[in-house]
Amino acid sequence: MDRLIGQILDALRHNNLDQNTLIVYMSDHGEQVGEHDLWWKQTFYEHSVKVPTILSWPGRLPEGKRLHQVVSSLDLNATLLDALDAPALPNSRGRSVLPLLEPTRSGQGVIWENMAFSEFCTDDSRQHRMIRQGEWKLNYYHGQPVQLFNLAEDPDELNDLAVHPDYTGIQQELIGRVHDGWDPDQIAETMRRKRADYNIIAGWARNTKPVDQYRWHLLPEMDYLDK
């Protein structure tokens, strides 16, 4: 991965674009890889849900600055549009992080809602939603007990505070925010309808075997994911 990123940076330098380009590195979600005795990714523990984001823009953004605010993947499009001085997307909840980073703005006077959500909704499992608000994080699994963590004091998420009465206030506040505009039963019904539509299309594809010139067919030796 480092080599391929290096090729992109070399191409920018070769074309004299390296000093006038905003570079954003962002990954997909993580994997549990045994943390909390779990594998794969369908949880909201930090190893699964948290992703790195690195921005580099010579002359515009300071080197080595680290944000302590809570940001979301939704903020990426708003940040790129802000960098282009383009209008924000309509109905987008994304927020540009440039006011928090640029020395000329230095974050002064920026009103930043220190909150982010993540969801996992399918037709074959309970609907999940997570909220991160400041140092607090609540994992909501519909029909199951919630989990509450203070990431400042417990970054490894080993001490579930949802069972402690001292934290009932913050727990109820976060549960209310989770349910604001989010109905797990309605979402489950929507996902079942989508699955029915998918099954029709999948059946058609199996029976007709349409030519797909855009499909990337892996060689047997490359298809290692399920081995």
Question: What is the predicted function of each stretch?
Answer:
Residues 31-35, 41-42, 62, 100, ...:
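Short catalytic/ligand-binding loop motif for oxyanion handling, primarily in non-cytosolic enzymes
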Residues 57, 131-134, 141, 151:
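Active-site beta-strand termini and strand-to-loop segments that position acidic
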Residues 163-227:
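Long, internal low-complexity/basic segments
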Residues 19-21, 63-129, 167, 172-176, ...:
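Polar, surface-exposed loop/tail segments
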Residues 2-9, 13, 77-81, 85, ...:
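Non-transmembrane alpha-helical segments in soluble domains
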Residues 1, 5, 22-27, 53-55, ...:
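Beta-strand elements within well-structured catalytic alpha/beta cores of enzymes
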Residues 46-50, 92, 126, 133, ...:
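Short, solvent-exposed loop/turn segments at the edges of secondary structure
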Residues 10-62, 69-72:
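Histidine-centered active-site microenvironments of extracellular/periplasmic hydrolases
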